[in-house]
Amino acid sequence: MIKVICVGTIKERYFKEAAEEYKKRLSRWTKIEEIEIKEEDENKYRNVEMLLKKEAEKILKHIKEGQYVVVFDINGTQLSSEEFAELLDRKVSKGEEIVFVIGGSNGLADAIKKRANLLISFSKLTFPHQLFRILVYEQIYRGFTIIKGIKYHK
């Protein structure tokens, strides 16, 4: 099973449709669960660290002992699509649950990064949150097509 925990919501219909399409495609190979964590209001907190701590508490409630946690972070390791597919294959073939965590506009608290088994960076570039979620789903889908030998990845 794959769980995707996201801070923030998708607002635009076309991003929602893209996410739903990838989740539908993935459903033939794995169960996929998406959890949206409401992004905290910056005006309620004295500083960003307190805001991130509150979001981290909400995220950690959805992560169980024994789950393999992958956090997306600009300072993480960059993987090729084939390496990402190998990671998926190793975990899914053993029946392990993988949890992908996507931070909000303020990033993620250190507590989440410390809980991660792996930090992954897609790029040094900054992406809009909604678009990044689609990129994550696309890479998970691409990974499964590589694993299954389906012509999609070039």
Curated annotation (Swiss-Prot):
Name a single GO cellular component: cytoplasm
E.C. number: 2.1.1.177
Main location, first listed in the record:
cytoplasm
Tell me the residue numbers annotated for binding S-adenosyl-L-methionine: 103, 122-127
Q: Which reaction does it catalyse?
A: pseudouridine(1915) in 23S rRNA + S-adenosyl-L-methionine = N(3)-methylpseudouridine(1915) in 23S rRNA + S-adenosyl-L-homocysteine + H(+)
Q: Which InterPro entries match?
A: Alpha/beta_knot_MTases (IPR029028), RlmH-like (IPR003742), tRNA_m1G_MTases_N (IPR029026)
Q: What keyword terms does UniProt attach to this protein?
A: Cytoplasm, Methyltransferase, rRNA processing, S-adenosyl-L-methionine, Transferase
Q: Where would you find this protein in the cell?
A: Cytoplasm
Instruction: List, in alphabetical order, the Gene Ontology terms for molecular function in this entry.
Output: rRNA (pseudouridine-N3-)-methyltransferase activity
Give the record's subunit note.
Homodimer.
NCBIfam families on file: PRK00103.1-3 (NF000985), PRK00103.1-4 (NF000986)
Please name the HAMAP family in this protein's record. 23SrRNA_methyltr_H
As for what it does, the entry says: Specifically methylates the pseudouridine at position 1915 (m3Psi1915) in 23S rRNA.
The similarity comment for this entry is:
Belongs to the RNA methyltransferase RlmH family.
PANTHER family assigned? METHYLTRANSFERASE (PTHR33603), RIBOSOMAL RNA LARGE SUBUNIT METHYLTRANSFERASE H (PTHR33603:SF1)
What is the protein name stated in its UniProt record? Ribosomal RNA large subunit methyltransferase H
* Species annotation: Caldicellulosiruptor saccharolyticus (strain ATCC 43494 / DSM 8903 / Tp8T 6331)
